[in-house]
Amino acid sequence: RGRDYEVSPILIAPVGKDALVFLNSQKNKVKNVTEQQLQDIYSGKIKNWKELGGEDLVIKAFQRPKNSGSQNLMEKFVMKDVEMMRPPSEWVATEMGELIEKVAAYDNSADAMGYSVYYYARNMKKGDGLQFLQVNGVEPNSDTIRSGDYPYTNPFYIAIRADEPKDSPAYQIYQWVLSMNGQALVNELGYVANEKSDVKISSEDLKKIGLEEKNDTVSGKYFP
């Protein structure tokens, strides 16, 4: 026999935004693509950079592993109901010596295109020769993501029970995350906070909450 449960009202508030961003090499003269062109690239209709005003190079359109955060956003925002083409792959040896096929990692070659989430990509070392592609003429940055002018933005929220006591840890965290200090931490982590904040989070404060000061150098694989 089923039980009757009382459902408590939820207090929910937006914390900030992330976004799906597209990248290619600074060696590539293509700086802007449209939403339709992105869908056509990843469905296999557009195959060469010259179709976008670039060099005569076959587009190496990298993808992310299935069910990763970036891939879920790609399917939701860009592809919608259109099937993606087969991704570039590579064979990797396991610890047991077996070879398995996996989605290839982005290599930033002149013919490459890839995508990631903004919070990760913005903290990558700029000297790696990457550039953000504009979408519909809009560059992904904190201002365009915050305003919603950039098309592929993804808001995230904080939620607690509406009847949570004001002196409870959950309520205090809720209030703090929405404060200027909390919004500064959202920015420090690489996301885009709802509100601009000039507050700086010190490395000592980051360590107090279990976070280390972020490292702007990334080597090896490019995307989460």
Protein language model regions, located:
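Exported/periplasmic ABC-transporter solute-binding proteins
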Residues: 1-224
